[in-house]
Every structure is written in structure tokens, then in C-alpha cells.
Amino acid sequence: MSKTEKNALDLLKGAYNLSTPDDNKKYYQGFAPFYDSVFVKDLGYTYPNVVANLLVKKFNLDGPICDIGCGTGLVADEIKKKAPNAVIDGVDISQDMIQISREKNLYRSLLELNLEDSLDPLSKDYSA
């Protein structure tokens, strides 16, 4: 295992030790700048592609999609490859992850939200 892969795995293990929303915010604040390169490039992260394939197969994507825990937009990127006209709103607890998503221009809207708080901002009709 390369040093980069070991560092990435150590970071991933840290995610399993998070217990509060503030822990999550702090963790992803530091991880956001290299999240995509670590998971996608270094570790061959395929989860976003798997999720996008399931969404396209199981749901009508004519209506808006809510990407909860959108992070840096990896899932939205895969959805757009399969359904280019999909309308996606993203929600994440980390402003740093949202900022990276915003730069990719994949979402209709992005919202920083702790899912333990009120979900009123999500009271839209989503198809998925």
C-alpha cells in the first residue's frame, strides 16, 4: 500500500469516529480540499457511480432530485452523466464540501443543513 493510500485510509477511519454534527463539520473542513483526489483517484471510489445507476434505474428523474450528504458532488456528477437534464439540489453539513460542489456547477441549489435540525428547507417535492 502506498503512503497516499495509507493516509487516505487513515482519514476514512476518522470518519467512523465522528459522533456530533460539529465533529462532522470539522472533519470535512480539513478533508474537503482533497476528498475527490483521495477517494476517486487514489482509492478508486465507485460508490457515486453505483448510486447514480440505481437512481436512474429505479426512479423517474423528470422531477428534482435531493442529494442529501452531497459532499463535493461526486454522485451528482455521475447522475448528470446518465441523465444530463436532471435537476439536483444538494444538502450537506459542511460548507467546505458545498463550496467544492458549487464550483462544479452541478446543482440547482446547495444548502448547508444539519439533518438533526428542521427539515423545512427540504419540503419540496422530490422524485428521488
Language model segments and positions:
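A short acidic, Gly/Pro-enriched loop at the edge of an enzyme's catalytic core
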Residues: D120-A128
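Class I SAM-dependent methyltransferase SAM/SAH-binding core
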Residues: C66-P121
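Class I SAM-dependent methyltransferase Rossmann-like catalytic core
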Residues: F31-T46
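N-terminal, positively charged/glycine-rich alpha-helical extensions of SAM-dependent methyltransferases
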Residues: M1-F34
